[in-house]
Amino acid sequence: MEAQFSNDTFSWSLQIAKFYVPPEAVYPVFFIGTLIYLFSVLCNGIILALILTQRSLHKPMFYIMFSLPLADLVGISSLLPRLLIDIVTLSNVVYYPTCVLQGFLLHLYAGSVLFVLAAIAFDRYIAICKPLRYHSIMTPFTVGGVIALAWGTDIALEVVLFALQARLPKCKTLIFNVYCDNMSLLKLSCGGDITVNNIYGLVLTGFMQVVSVSIQVFSYTQILKTCISHSQSDARKKAVNTCSAQLITFSLFEIVGIFGILSYRFQNIPPNAQKVCGIMIFTILPVLNPIIYGMNTRDIRNAFFMALKKQRFAFT
């Protein structure tokens, strides 16, 4: 759906809020930001490559988990490179189609994390609470359906969100954040009724949270009950280790998200601090997730060291 414009004065070139960095700190910030981005790309890329190439990871859990580093790459790549370029070039111009694309991808990332974590929790519930039926339930068809449902639902919901935004006439050209999102794009409109947009946005956020949290709470509650009732300590330890990474990731995502939202509700917080909180939502998890999964998932650690050994033998 193409955006409507109220008059000929609307420019496709938008002014986006600047992230203030002292002149003497511009290049250090750019250098550190680039290292953070490259670290995230490298680590998430390694996780993706391991799942694709290591037969020990060709299991339903890791096929579903494949979507998590993929989403992390979408999130951080949609935000950090452009922000770093703007900082070093002192530019604050963004074109409307690029702005819409960035906003869509950032919203897609946030939704995909919630749905993928719910899918992983469901897989762990079946594996730990119904181990004898695991392979009969988590067939390739079921795994593919779970992955398609997670991404398909997210994409469909975000398409509707941005289609509702695109129908509004535009006349303003200032983006009040350092990145584009649905709310920033809504503020470009003039004269249009955004009631439907606000209602849908609230319903969308609530739906995603309720679905994701409900599935995870149910799954991990059942897993906890199974662990408590299980007599073998090794089985308990394995169950806890296999779920800890997902719980850490979900907790971090919710804490950072809530912190970022609350930062805009208090007027005494400096604008730059608010912008940092917003940026953290799309950078913290993409950087930390590979570390979290590498430390807490034994199969990934073993696959990584096995791949290193193969490479070492290949060059000797």
Please provide the spans of the model-predicted regions.
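Transmembrane helical core of 7TM receptor-like proteins
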Residues: 1-316
